[in-house]
Amino acid sequence: MWTWDQSAGTLSRGGKIVSRGYSGKGRGVNNPSLQGVAGIGPIPRGRWIMINRYDSKNVGPFTITLNAVDSTPDDRHDATGRGAFRIHGDSIRAPGTASKGCIILPRAIREMVWRSGDHELEVIE
């Protein structure tokens, strides 16, 4: 299982940090206290499943779709009501501004994560 640390902005597996990134916008970047604020806070704590990957015309190539592991099998997080979470790349024009809650990681890391076959993610504070 992969682990995303909300406050540190790190992706780990087996206790080893694999990459650094960010989740959230403005004051919400890697700020767990704002996880419930749509469009600003980081991806909410909990378990997620990576269900597919695709090339997005909006957020770029090798985007990974995340579904919350909760009472409803969809990409909406029941506890916060937020949804549409992805793992995708950063903005080329304005680095550090691509997330409204999605996890932003380099493409090589996204490819490695997907190809690992381990599609479970736990988001911790």
Regions found by a protein language model. Give the residues of each.
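Gly/Pro-biased beta-strand-loop elements
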Residues: 1-83
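Exported/periplasmic cell-wall-interacting domains
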Residues: 47, 54-125
